[in-house]
Design a protein with these regions (language model features):
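Cell-envelope/ECM-targeting effectors and their regulatory/trafficking segments
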Residues: 1-173
Length: 173
């Protein structure tokens, strides 16, 4: 199994969110391929599911995930190489907003819980696939910190679009 470093510090980092943001620049999308079993494979799998592909969210980039990535690349007119790289991620992530439900929302909620990005396990969004008030609060707080400290182009609107997804998925890796 490949355990490549994707983006940012390794899983298990306990840096506070503000410390992360102080040094944060827009990280490149991670490169994921068959054999990987590192963050953010679960996010990739959730987004594939959100796009209609049947794949388990198990954190392992196995044959089923590889087939789903290749199928998505064909559907999207991308180079079919089975690698989830910048172009695949940019086409794959689903814009979500308050009131939305489903696997893309679950991905976001998992990301906020990953290494306690939410700031407090007690306040972390419940992973239920519903973009409710608690999830929106975390999105807006995260966007505001990003806007103030690292990426002034980030709009604080509670909508998770391409740039917000890239920041959330790549901020810790």
């Amino acid at each position: 199994m490949t355990t490549v470093q994707t983006c940012g510090p390794p899983h298990g980092s306990t840096m506070a969110m503000e410390a992360i943001l102080m040094a944060l620049a827009l990280e490149p999308w991670p490169l994921l391929r068959i054999g990987d079993n590192v963050h953010p494979v679960p996010s990739l799998q959730y987004h594939l599911r959100a796009r209609g592909h049947r794949v388990a969210v198990d954190g392992v980039f196995g044959a089923a995930t590889d087939a789903a990535v290749r199928a998505f690349q064909i559907e999207s007119g991308l180079v079919v190489d089975g690698v989830a790289g910048p172009r695949t991620w940019a086409a794959l992530v689903v814009t979500i907003r308050p009131g939305d439900q489903g696997d893309a929302v679950r991905s976001l909620q998992e990301e906020f819980n990953y290494t306690e990005l939410s700031g407090s396990p007690v306040d972390a969004p419940v992973v239920d696939g519903v973009f409710g008030p608690r999830t929106e609060t975390h999105v807006r707080k995260w966007q505001q910190l990003l806007h103030d400290r690292a990426e002034p182009d980030v709009v604080v609107d509670g909508v998770v679009g391409l740039k917000t997804w890239q920041m959330v998925i790549c901020r810790l890796g």
